[in-house]
């Protein structure tokens, strides 16, 4: 069994459901110390984080990821116990196999192999690892980034090991992500008897036209790198449970995934204009999740594309689709950020799995990226 698969199995066997780390970071740290990395422990609250670096000058390439995983769901429905990983017919099963302990293992072994070959390499190699990516993401990467920015730590390039691939390893790499923010809207009416609607104000009826207008609005056209901004209602709650009572208020939650054509303030203004146009009595709370970011083709993207082509003989598609990741926090540093990892078909599902050989190939890709950036100068 390869070193990458051995390490992946060891990491997956540790039940690190957010915000637990279950010893995963200690395992990685031990390996990194052995090849000359300096380790900085950066815990915040209940969350374990660390920043490790090798080298003191030149561009800094950071490998970023998370040791926490989502809950398993009913363990009886797994064909393999989620924290007792096994390779069956060439497929590695276990919670975190794809998201993202397989990537972490590939990163560590890639760096081990690169350092063994180039002990005096140019540049700096770093790791930024958290146990709070799948949860509230309050005390994880965002806190580490803030601390690094306060001391003017420069991270030039970053590879996030999120499972970016769809059908085959390396077919898609994420060179950006849309921005995200949510609204929690409360619309007020007047409770009453359904038989006397003139004595009541139904907040469901009042809110429906405004929500429909937002759902049908054309927010922007997107651009060459981002699809158009999307609006989705995620939850609506109203009523007492009785069929003869007009409710007194309605709560609706919604989310925007927005392109670089708009920002939080512009979208907020348009939402308020729609709500006010419909003469609603309302309160609204906003949750800002992050701005869009984009890494244009250049030194990092070119190094990654070449490494994928050389290793698995395909040319990856550059994409900004999908949800958010911790890359949005790292991008605040002015860092070029790209996500590259395993196939994402089973992430967060029962029987999460990944092709075992693809993790060996992923390690080769990461190592070749290092070669392209630091050994071909």
Swiss-Prot record:
Keyword match Metal-binding: yes
Active site: 68, 133
Disulfide linkage: none
GO molecular function terms attached to this record: acetylornithine deacetylase activity; cobalt ion binding; succinyl-diaminopimelate desuccinylase activity; zinc ion binding
Reaction equations catalysed: N-succinyl-(2S,6S)-2,6-diaminopimelate + H2O = (2S,6S)-2,6-diaminopimelate + succinate
Enzyme Commission no: 3.5.1.18
Cofactor: record remark: Binds 2 Zn(2+) or Co(2+) ions per subunit.
Pfam hit, one: M20_dimer
A Gene Ontology biological process term: diaminopimelate biosynthetic process
Class in the EC hierarchy, top level: hydrolase
Residues at which Zn(2+) 2 binds: 99, 134, 348
Entry cofactors: Zn(2+); Co(2+)
Pathway: Amino-acid biosynthesis; L-lysine biosynthesis via DAP pathway; LL-2,6-diaminopimelate from (S)-tetrahydrodipicolinate (succinylase route): step 3/3
Similarity remark: Belongs to the peptidase M20A family. DapE subfamily.
Subunit structure and binding partners: Homodimer.
PANTHER family named among the record's database cross-references: ACETYLORNITHINE DEACETYLASE (PTHR43808), N-ACETYL-L-CITRULLINE DEACETYLASE (PTHR43808:SF31)
Purpose: Catalyzes the hydrolysis of N-succinyl-L,L-diaminopimelic acid (SDAP), forming succinate and LL-2,6-diaminopimelate (DAP), an intermediate involved in the bacterial biosynthesis of lysine and meso-diaminopimelic acid, an essential component of bacterial cell walls.
Protein name, UniProt field: Succinyl-diaminopimelate desuccinylase
Organism: Marinomonas sp. (strain MWYL1)
């Amino acid at each position: 069994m390869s070193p990458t698969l051995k390490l992946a199995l060891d990491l997956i066997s540790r039940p690190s459901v957010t915000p637990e780390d279950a010893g995963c970071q200690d395992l990685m740290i031990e390996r990194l110390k052995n090849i000359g990395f300096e380790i900085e422990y950066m815990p915040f609250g209940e969350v374990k984080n660390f920043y490790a670096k090798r080298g003191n000058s030149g561009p800094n390439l950071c490998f970023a990821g998370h040791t926490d995983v989502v809950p398993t769901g009913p363990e009886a429905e797994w064909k393999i116990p989620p924290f007792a990983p096994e390779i069956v017919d060439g497929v590695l099963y276990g919670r975190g196999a794809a998201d993202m302990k397989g990537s972490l293992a590939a990163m560590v072994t890639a760096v081990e192999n690169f350092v063994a070959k180039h002990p005096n390499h140019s540049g700096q190699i770093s790791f930024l690892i958290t146990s709070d990516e799948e949860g509230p993401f309050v005390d994880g990467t965002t806190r580490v980034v803030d601390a690094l920015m306060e001391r003017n730590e420069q991270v030039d390039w970053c590879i996030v090991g999120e499972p970016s691939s769809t059908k085959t390893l390396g077919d898609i790499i994420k060179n950006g992500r849309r921005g995200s923010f949510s609204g929690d809207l409360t619309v007020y009416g007047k409770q009453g008897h359904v038989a006397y609607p003139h004595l009541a104000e139904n907040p469901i009826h009042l809110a429906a036209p405004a929500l429909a207008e937002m759902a049908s609005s054309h927010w922007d056209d997107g651009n060459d790198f981002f699809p158009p901004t999307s609006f989705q209602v995620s939850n609506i709650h109203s009523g007492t449970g009785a069929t003869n009572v007009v409710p007194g208020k309605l709560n609706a939650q919604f989310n925007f995934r927005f392109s670089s054509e708009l920002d939080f303030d512009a979208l907020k203004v348009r939402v308020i204009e729609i709500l006010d146009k419909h003469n609603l009595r309302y309160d609204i709370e906003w949750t800002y999740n992050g701005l869009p970011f984009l890494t244009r083709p250049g030194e990092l993207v070119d190094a990654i594309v070449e490494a994928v082509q050389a290793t698995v003989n395909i040319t990856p598609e550059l994409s900004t689709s999908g949800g958010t990741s911790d890359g949005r926090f790292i991008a605040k540093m002015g860092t070029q950020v790209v996500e590259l990892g395993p196939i994402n078909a089973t992430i967060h599902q029962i029987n999460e799995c990944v092709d075992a050989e693809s993790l060996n190939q992923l390690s080769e890709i990461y190592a070749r990226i290092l070669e392209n950036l630091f050994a071909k100068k």
